[in-house]
Amino acid sequence: MSNTEQLREMAKTLVTPHKGILAADQSPRTMNKQLEALGLPPEAELRRKYRQLLFTTEGLQEYVTGVILHDGTIRNHADDGTEFSDLLIAKGVVPIIKVDKSTVPHTNFEGEVVTQGLDGLADRLQEYYDMGARAAKWRAVFTISENTPTEQNILFDCMTLARYAALCQEAGIVPMVEPEVLFSGSHSLERAEEVTTMVLQKLFEQLQWNNVDLEGVILKSSMVLAGSEWSEQTSAADVAQATLRTFMNSVPPEVPGIVFLSGGQTPQRATENLDAIAELEAQEGGFPWELAFSFSRGLEQPVQEAWQGKDENIEAAQAALIKRLQLNSMADQGTYDPSME
């Protein structure tokens, strides 16, 4: 099988119907904040134990195709010495590696950021491939305000995403491209749709200019939502309409799948919106791409609350993870109901 065929096969596997992708790629800094919110010390060993809790959950592979890992996590191991990546592979779950090196201010563009991490990326991808990673993730961030995002900022980040994607495919790794349009802000649903459409159109233009094989790419996208500070919060039905209209106007049919980030929504709201999107998709007779979930907070918040850093709570925390995964799997089929919570 050629490299192109292998990439396309892996991309399809990652968007297997009614399964999702667990985003467990919080940086040590973000994970430490989550530990502190539970009243726990921000320690490396607690971070490792938490990841072990997630990855050893019985039945995880029934609901997820892949898990996104931070660099520190793919290099870490379970209590018995098994590398986390090997533990996942043994379950039939694909290790996905986050490879960007976070954001820095975009010089001369106030209030905007760009993502860094291209330097040395080809070598890092080779190392991650050898460690078992078969997909990667790179996140760009766009803030909506009266003056942002600018065309220049969108172009810069989309060029970077395209270069990253090309390097991934060269290394035999499926690129997940994540242009996140932030939920925070006081923008309307219409403005969110306008910006998300603009960003996605520019992204796919750049991917095509860089000869990236779109059949070997996964898009990780925001849902289209009015800003968190906008006076009227969007109904699930309106989110579904705006999101699917945006995709129809910007995502080429060759792309095998689109996975959603939860992006600061509560776990229940993210699930409700996913369900509305699936219901609308069924009404419309389907779309060219598989649609799935790739939540972090939207899956893990209840897990952390159940765990509280205590070994005696591991079973309850793992049960909370399976419950959230089941609810999102049902939402992905349009069969979720809030009474199931």
Roles of regions detected by a PLM:
Residues 67, 136, 175-176, 217, ...:
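Hydrophobic residues within beta-strands of alpha/beta enzymes
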Residues 101, 142, 181, 223-225:
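Short, histidine-centered active-site or binding-site loop motifs used for metal coordination
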Residues 1-131, 144, 232, 236, ...:
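Alpha/beta catalytic barrel-like cores
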Residues 121-207:
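Helix-rich catalytic cores of soluble enzyme domains
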Residues 71, 140, 221:
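Residues that line or immediately flank small-molecule/substrate-binding pockets and catalytic motifs
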Residues 43, 138, 177, 219, ...:
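Conserved, mostly hydrophobic/aromatic
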Residues 183-254:
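Catalytic core of soluble alpha/beta enzymes
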Residues 74-75, 182-184, 226, 300:
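Short, active-site-adjacent cap segments at secondary-structure transitions
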